[in-house]
C-alpha cells in the first residue's frame, strides 16, 4: 500500500517489445535480458498472493487498477479489488477464474484484499491479513485472518469450474492483522515481517478518516495443519520500533557464505522521522536473529518490486536483481549519474544488490531498464527447472549459456514518475533471461586474496578503503571513463581515505592493485 505525496512530472511512456540486455563490465558476472510473452490479453493485477504448480500459476487478491487514489472518495475503490481467484496456464497462456462471491462474505472479503502476506508450505498457500473492504462492518480495515488454500485442488477447481469453497479454510487471530509486510517460512516455522494495521478510508494529506499502527515486529510462529484442523501456536516477537517501522518492502531469500539460509529485508517505507524510505538492510535468520547493517545505503528500488536472487558458490557472493518499482534515486544511463528525487517516484531502473563474503555491500544499476515505469508490486516467478537451492536462490555457477530463470508478472504501470491518475495494472508477462559471463567469473576467481572494504558506500564527502594485505598496494579512484581521479600507494596495513566532496553524483570505481592482480569495486557518490 503506497502512501506518499506526489507532484506531476510528465515524461513519455516507452514500451520495449524486443529483447534488450546489459552487463556491467568487471562487476556483475552475468547478463540480464527481458522480453515480453506474446499472448492474448491476460488479467490485469497487482499486489496479489501467488503460488505455482507445474505450468499453472494461482493468484488470490490484489487490485485490477493502478495506484490507489489519494482522497476519501477514490482510495482503494471496492470495484477495483480483485473479486476472483485466477489461474494462468503458462503452457498455453490461457487463463481461468472463479468468483469469490460464491463464498460466505466473512470468508470472501479477506481474499479480496490488497498486500496480504503469504507463503507456501507443502501443498498449501497460507495467506495472512491484507487491507480491504469489510462488508459486514461496512468499512475498510486490515483483516486478522489466516487462510489456508490447497494449491493443486484450487487450481483444478478454477480450471474445471467446480466449487472452490472446499479448498479454503480460515481462522482469526489478531496477530495477523497486518498488511504490507512479508511472510516467509523455514523448517516448519513461519516469520511475519513488519507491515502495519490500517483501518478506515485512506487520504493524503492525512485526515481523521483512518488509523494506522505499524507492527514494528518480526513475528515467529507455527502453523498447525492436518488438512482439516487449522491453528497457530508458539508465537514469539522480535520488536524494534525504529528499524522495523517498515512496510511495502522486499524480503528476499539469501544464501550465506557458510551455505546456510536466511533472508534480507531491503528498504521499505516510511521512516519515523520523515516521509522517506529506509535505506539500510536487515539480515535475518532463525538462529542469529536480526542484524541491521547501517554501513550500507540502498539508494534504488526502495519499494516492493520483483526481485531475483542468485548465489556465487565460489566467491560466496549474493546477487539480488531488483526490477523497477519506486526509488529515492534514479539512474541516468546516459550520464551514469544518480539523481535524487525525494518524492520517491516510479522508475524503470534495474539494479543488482551485491553482498560479498566479507560483508561488503554495493548496488549496481544496469544499463538495461524496465519497459516503462513499472515494477512496483510486480512478482518474479522462478522457473522451477533452473538449478536452485531449496529456498529458490539460483545457483549461478551451475548456469550454462542463456537460461530462462523466470517471469515478471503483474504490477503497476505508470505514465509519469510522480502522480497517481495515469497508472494501471500490468497485463503483460515478461521472460527474464540470465547468461553467466564465464570470463568475468574466472576473473573474479583470480582476484587477490584478502579483504577489501569500502565504506561508506554510497559515499558523500569521503570514502575509506581498508585492506588486510601487508605489502605494496596501489589504490585508485576512477571515473566512468576509467580516468584516475585519486591514487595512493601504501606499504603497510592502513586505511586509505579519498576526499570525494567535489565529485559529481554518479558511479565510480575503486581499483586495488596487488602485484599483477587487480580488483575493482563500484563506488556510488550521492548528495
Predicted segment positions?
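C-terminal outer-membrane/trafficking sorting elements
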Residues: 21, 25, 445-455, 459-527
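Blade-edge beta-strand/turn elements of extracellular beta-propeller
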Residues: 27-38, 93-106, 154-174, 221-242, ...
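Beta-strand-rich domains and repeat architectures in extracellular enzymes and scaffolds
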Residues: 36-80
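Beta-propeller and closely related beta-sheet repeat lectin domains
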Residues: 46-50, 112-118, 179-183, 247-252, ...
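Beta-propeller blade signature
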Residues: 74-94, 139-157, 205-227, 277-289, ...
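Blade-loop segments of beta-propeller domains
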Residues: 75-122, 132-134
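Asp-box/WD-like beta-propeller blade repeats and closely related beta-sheet repeat scaffolds
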Residues: 108-115, 132-186
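Loop/turn-rich, solvent-exposed surfaces of beta-rich toroidal or solenoidal domains
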Residues: 301-395
Amino acid at each position: 500500500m503506497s502512501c506518499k505525496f506526489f507532484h506531476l512530472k510528465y515524461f513519455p511512456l516507452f514500451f520495449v517489445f524486443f529483447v534488450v540486455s546489459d552487463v556491467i563490465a568487471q562487476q556483475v558476472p552475468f547478463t540480464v535480458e527481458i522480453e515480453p510473452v506474446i499472448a492474448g490479453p491476460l488479467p490485469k493485477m497487482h499486489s496479489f498472493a501467488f503460488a505455482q504448480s507445474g505450468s499453472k500459476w494461482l493468484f488470490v487478491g490484489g487490485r485490477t487498477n493502478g495506484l490507489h487514489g489519494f482522497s476519501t472518495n477514490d482510495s482503494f475503490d471496492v470495484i477495483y479489488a480483485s473479486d476472483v481467484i485466477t489461474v494462468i496456464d503458462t503452457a498455453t497462456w490461457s487463463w481461468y477464474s472463479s468468483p469469490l462471491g460464491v463464498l460466505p462474505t466473512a470468508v470472501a472479503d479477506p481474499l479480496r484484499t490488497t498486500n496480504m502476506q503469504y507463503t507456501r508450505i507443502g501443498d498449501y498457500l497460507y495467506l495472512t491479513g491484507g487491507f480491504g473492504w469489510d462488508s459486514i462492518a461496512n468499512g475498510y480495515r486490515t483483516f486478522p485472518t489466516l487462510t489456508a488454500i490447497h494449491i493443486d485442488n484450487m487450481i483444478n477447481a478454477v480450471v474445471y469450474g467446480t466449487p472452490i469453497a472446499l479448498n479454503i479454510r480460515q481462522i482469526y487471530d489478531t496477530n495477523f492483522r497486518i498488511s504490507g509486510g512479508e511472510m516467509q517460512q523455514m523448517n516448519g516455522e513461519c516469520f511475519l515481517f513488519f507491515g502495519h494495521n490500517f483501518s478506515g478510508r485512506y487520504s493524503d494529506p492525512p485526515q481523521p478518516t483512518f488509523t494506522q499502527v505499524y507492527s514494528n515486529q518480526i513475528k515467529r510462529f507455527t502453523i498447525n495443519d492436518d488438512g482439516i484442523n487449522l491453528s497457530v501456536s508458539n508465537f514469539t516477537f522480535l520488536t524494534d520500533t525504529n528499524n522495523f517501522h517498515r512496510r511495502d518492502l522486499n524480503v528476499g531469500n539469501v544464501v550465506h557464505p557458510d551455505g546456510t539460509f536466511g533472508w534480507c529485508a531491503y528498504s521499505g517505507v516510511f521512516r519515523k522521522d520523515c516521509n522517506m524510505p529506509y535505506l539500510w538492510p536487515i539480515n535475518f535468520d532463525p538462529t542469529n536473529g536480526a542484524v541491521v547493517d547501517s554501513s550500507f545505503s540502498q539508494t534504488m528500488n526502495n519499494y516492493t518490486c520483483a526481485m531475483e536472487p542468485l548465489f556465487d558458490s565460489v566467491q560466496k557472493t549474493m546477487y539480488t536483481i531488483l526490477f523497477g518499482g519506486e526509488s529515492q534515486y534514479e539512474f541516468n544511463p546516459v550520464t551514469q549519474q544518480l539523481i535524487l528525487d525525494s518524492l520517491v517516484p516510479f522508475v524503470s531502473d534495474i539494479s543488482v544488490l551485491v553482498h560479498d563474503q566479507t560483508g561488503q555491500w554495493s548496488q549496481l544499476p544496469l544499463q538495461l531498464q524496465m519497459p516503462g515505469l513499472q515494477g512496483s508490486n510486480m512478482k518474479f516467478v522462478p522457473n522451477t527447472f533452473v538449478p536452485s537451492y531449496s529456498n529458490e536462490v539460483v545457483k549461478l555457477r551451475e548456469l550454462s549459456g542463456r537460461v530462462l530463470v523466470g517471469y515478471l508478472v503483474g504490477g503497476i504501470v505508470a505514465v509519469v514518475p510522480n502522480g497517481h491518475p495515469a497508472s494501471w495494472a500490468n497485463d503483460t508477462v515478461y521472460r527474464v533471461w540470465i547468461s553467466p559471463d564465464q570470463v568475468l567469473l574466472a576473473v573474479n576467481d583470480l582476484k587477490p586474496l584478502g579483504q577489501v572494504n569500502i565504506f561508506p558506500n554510497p559515499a558523500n564527502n569521503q570514502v575509506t578503503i581498508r585492506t588486510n594485505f601487508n605489502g605494496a598496494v596501489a589504490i585508485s579512484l576512477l571515473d566512468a571513463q576509467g580516468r584516475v581521479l585519486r591514487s595512493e600507494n601504501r606499504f603497510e596495513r592502513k586505511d586509505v581515505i579519498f576526499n570525494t566532496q567535489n565529485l559529481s553524483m554518479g558511479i565510480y570505481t575503486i581499483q586495488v592493485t596487488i602485484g599483477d592482480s587487480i580488483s575493482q569495486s563500484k563506488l556510488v557518490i550521492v548528495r
